[in-house]
Amino acid sequence: MPKNSKVTQREHSSEHVTESVADLLALEEPVDYKQSVLNVAGEAGGKQKAVEEELDAEDRPAWNSKLQYILAQIGFSVGLGNIWRFPYLCQKNGGGAYLVPYLVLLIIIGIPLFFLELAVGQRIRRGSIGVWHYICPRLGGIGFSSCIVCLFVGLYYNVIIGWSIFYFFKSFQYPLPWSECPVVRNGSVAVVEAECEKSSATTYFWYREALDISDSISESGGLNWKMTLCLLVAWSIVGMAVVKGIQSSGKVMYFSSLFPYVVLACFLVRGLLLRGAVDGILHMFTPKLDKMLDPQVWREAATQVFFALGLGFGGVIAFSSYNKQDNNCHFDAALVSFINFFTSVLATLVVFAVLGFKANIMNEKCVVENAEKILGYLNTNVLSRDLIPPHVNFSHLTTKDYMEMYNVIMTVKEDQFSALGLDPCLLEDELDKSVQGTGLAFIAFTEAMTHFPASPFWSVMFFLMLINLGLGSMIGTMAGITTPIIDTFKVPKEMFTVGCCVFAFLVGLLFVQRSGNYFVTMFDDYSATLPLTLIVILENIAVAWIYGTKKFMQELTEMLGFRPYRFYFYMWKFVSPLCMAVLTTASIIQLGVTPPGYSAWIKEEAAERYLYFPNWAMALLITLIVVATLPIPVVFVLRHFHLLSDGSNTLSVSYKKGRMMKDISNLEENDETRFILSKVPSEAPSPMPTHRSYLGPGSTSPLETSGNPNGRYGSGYLLASTPESEL
């Protein structure tokens, strides 16, 4: 009796099999089924076709442990956006008030859709292309669109890692190279670089020394050789990590996923000990409740939830496809989502502690500069000394004393006050000066670290953390490209991965020009937002409305051993698609109301200026969006008009946990012997499907079905509910 005798008995039950077929199956004797040959008639001479019987579950690589898998998912979902985008949005949208819409949308959009992607990847054990082709062939373009979006994101994301590598190596100096403005000699006279003097040392180092940025996107300025080398190093590291496979990548994840938390914890402890850190923390948690009613806040919170978990990229599906079938992906979805949120809050605490310290430093600098102005006015008798409170000591002027003096002068000299050019030096104003995106990491943080004791050490730790966070996300992004392509087209993994990295490096040279930062902005803000939203909406529709939410819940029950909460049924069926549709509409309206643009650094002004993209850049932007979404309608149309095979000529029946994978080509509906292994018997259960999708009630024809002969989900995709059936 085979080890899976109960399954064999059930599958061989005469309830769904004709008597003659059952008799033939009863004659099977145990042999090595891997050598069996399948007779496929219908061709001249009754052609014999050898069938490869290797089990998919055994052939596919698997994680060495559950911990490796969890760390990989955390490494993919927790990225650079948690360090700079979430804190920026929190600061911009009302501090603590922003956390409320974020949490609500995380629960009704983030966790359900994250669970959905984990489940389909684990159940079907394929990358994004294979998964969506399996569920609904006409929506198979979803997987290709995911791959394209991953490619677009990977192109510029690795550039940011390259920037971090550049700063990492520059951190092994004391003092840090961005702590002071460079001095330029004009003959015998030494003067401070004008661009740096007008801005700041950290701003100058970022724009001039690191990026050597041009004044607009239209001025390419040639390649920045320093960043080109850093980009080459970044792609080399990513390529080696992906080529080694998930087992080796899993080992890397032990370090790359955990190290950032060590650094963030150290930064938080150190940050809380800084003067003014409490001011920053209080500013973060002081809610501005009026912001909660602003639709823009909800739109940005939804977008952040969407990107934070990596939905639609295919990386989540790729990683979960290497899991065991009985893995509790429901627990994984909740755990990874919570850790992602916790990381965002932890990073925000660190950012606001550092910004509170920086705000106090800048506020004190403001007080000193304005006190010097007042002293000048006193010496020139523009102001009377009677306006200065007697207890004020200019040698040790506090912020409180300055504010008292400022208010007196403003009251007495009301008519001439504006001409004095005095600044109130309010701490709140400094805290409200939001720094977005790369500026937060490469300007605000670097400036704060120049005031840290042992600043090179903290700088090395910070940029090593950014590199690790970036690499964790990049490995998942590359998995979203390589896994579905390798699964679908069976290309050699090593050659394909190396080819992808070389191609991405060459295209990535666009981002290491002097104008490269503007292209990074274009790709980051526009190339992925709309395509990813559309991808996730269609993923949700494919599972909840085409495959069927009830059927999907039943499949999850069989896979997990328990039935998921009813909550997910309503989220997948109604709430999540509706919210995503509203988000898409809002994004399109926002794009139409506000023409796309970017912040350009003007050298002569030493300041940023918002510019609109030129026509050719707009054409490129639209092309990126179209290219990312084009596979979806193209595949749908081709399969709808039968111009592209949807797999109807090959029926693939997967038997997990010891069952065979059989490919039976060109089956004739009325010849039941087409399902029987040739005269060489097999120990393994017969690959004959026994569900009524194949054998209708009272039917003697193996492929005769009631209703649509091609099934509900496309030609050749009749779903068999065997005990371990595919999704």
Curated annotation (Swiss-Prot):
Q: Could you tell me where the Polar residues compositional bias lies? A: 698-709
Q: Where in the cell is it found?
A: Cytoplasmic vesicle, Secretory vesicle, Synaptic vesicle membrane; Postsynapse; Presynapse
| GO BP terms, alphabetized | alanine transport; brain development; glycine transport; L-leucine transport; neurotransmitter transport; neutral amino acid transport; proline transport; protein catabolic process
Q: Does the keyword Transmembrane helix apply?
A: yes
Membrane-spanning parts: 70-90, 96-116, 148-168, 223-243, 254-274, 301-321, 335-355, 461-481, 491-511, 528-548, 574-594, 618-638
Q: Which residues carry this modification: Phosphoserine?
A: S13, S20, S665, S701
Positions annotated with a glycan in the UniProt record:
N186, N393
Which disease does the record tie it to? Intellectual developmental disorder, autosomal recessive 48: A disorder characterized by significantly below average general intellectual functioning associated with impairments in adaptive behavior and manifested during the developmental period. MRT48 patients show moderate to severe intellectual disability and additional features including progressive tremor, speech impairment, and sometimes behavioral problems.
Give the protein's function. Synaptic vesicle transporter with apparent selectivity for neutral amino acids. The transport is sodium-coupled but chloride-independent, likely driven by the proton electrochemical gradient generated by vacuolar H(+)-ATPase in an overall electrogenic mechanism. May contribute to the synaptic uptake of neurotransmitter precursors in a process coupled in part to vesicle exocytosis.
- Quote the protein name from its UniProt record: Sodium-dependent neutral amino acid transporter SLC6A17
Question: Which gene codes for it?
Answer: SLC6A17
